Amino acid sequence: MAETFRLKIIAPTGVFFDDDIERVVIRGIEGELAILAEHTPLTTNVAIGTFNIIFADKKKKNGTLLGGIATINPRETIILTDAAEWPEEIDIKRAQEAKERALKRIHDDKFDTARARAALERAIARINSKENV
């Protein structure tokens, strides 16, 4: 059995996840980051995107992180995020509508392009999470 470590994901609404796992893959600002037990200490930004957990029994679970910061230590990783969601919590129709709305706003001078791009990124992350169940 592979070695495990504690993963805590904390959102403004409270503790989203708190359990021992074998591995988690998150999206950092420079690409994907796989975290295992005994990882070198690191603090990094977390980009909007999906995350994938593998438990010691090899069961898998994925979800969505809407940005944040991760503090990684050999025995524990803590992710503070703006929001986290499990695929079953995502309304796919609403996410697709948000994607379409954001795409229109990116090309409209009346809207803040940066905010529209962030909304697009969130919508795509939600759609990807829901489709990868």
Swiss-Prot record:
Keywords: ATP synthesis, Cell membrane, CF(1), Ion transport, Membrane, Sodium, Sodium transport, Transport. Inhibited by nitrate. It comes from the Bacteria. GO terms for cellular component: plasma membrane; proton-transporting ATP synthase complex. GO terms for molecular function: ATP binding; proton-transporting ATP synthase activity, rotational mechanism. It is found in: Cell membrane. The keyword Manganese does not apply. InterPro entries: ATP_F1_dsu/esu_C_sf (IPR036794), ATP_synth_F1_dsu/esu (IPR001469), ATP_synth_F1_dsu/esu_N (IPR020546), ATP_synth_F1_esu_C (IPR020547), ATPsynth_dsu/esu_N (IPR036771). CDD domains: F1-ATPase_delta. It is a peripheral membrane protein. GO terms for biological process: sodium ion transport. It holds the Pfam family ATP-synt_DE. Belongs to the ATPase epsilon chain family. F-type ATPases have 2 components, CF(1) - the catalytic core - and CF(0) - the membrane proton channel. CF(1) has five subunits: alpha(3), beta(3), gamma(1), delta(1), epsilon(1). CF(0) has three main subunits: a, b and c. Produces ATP from ADP in the presence of a sodium gradient across the membrane. This is ATP synthase epsilon chain, sodium ion specific. It comes from Acetobacterium woodii (strain ATCC 29683 / DSM 1030 / JCM 2381 / KCTC 1655 / WB1). The lineage of its organism: Bacteria, Bacillati, Bacillota, Clostridia, Eubacteriales.
